Amino acid sequence: MAGVSSESLSAALASLETKLAHASLELSAELFGTVDVLDGNAGLRRALTDPARGASDKAGLVAQLLHGKVSAEAESTVASLATSRWSSARDIGDALETVAATVAIAVAERQGGSAGLERLEEDLFAFIRVVGSSHDLQRALDDSKATAEAKGALALKLVPNASDASALLIRQAVASPRGLKPVALLERFVELVAKRQDRWIAQVSVTRDLTAEQTARLQAGLNNLYGRDLKINVEIDPALVGGIRIKVGDEVVDATVATRVAELRRQLAS
């Protein structure tokens, strides 16, 4: 996904972030179910991504499709995606799949913090390893004659201790891999988990080692700012000249001398 579709997905994920504190696995399942509906109706995908249609028209189509069948939160999430811009009709389904998986991952995070994300990742990797080492299992999960329910039941037998979030993502991958092998789709989900884990790590760049007191103050300040216990990784970079650069997830705080000098040079050159 690239261009305008990538921008629309980024905006959707940013908007979703404000709602994840109350999100549920039920919401994730509803969104995954809507992905299946979109995949089965090319005309609907084209209608929802047609740039000639107005936002209210698209929202109306979503209401006709989903109202009373899913939660209001699921309906509004799909409507928001429908009123965004997409490079191709398929991209809206891909984006909704990413949003649905992100909801499930965030639920695991809310329930267990960083440890919850680690367990989710371990569950998914365990399934990937088991299936990847067995041609018989791969054939069984690829069998077009087998029902989604049968594939899901088989998959969960392979990871009997999987968390609820893990089970949801695994079932989705085997029941609706959307043109991929189930393992390949789960690997994409693992990438989303890893990106979520980055929110628990502060990458700190400084010109020299921090003292124990400085590290403790930095730890306390970052934990207070982000509302969670972050792991701090310190990198020594003499090129920064002075100051500090902190990266947590996609957020970067750059208070280095090198950056300030570069900005001054840009201003003088303009």
Predicted segments with their positions:
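Elongated, mostly alpha-helical coiled-coil "stalk/stator" tethers of large membrane protein machines
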Residues: 1-245, 251, 255-270
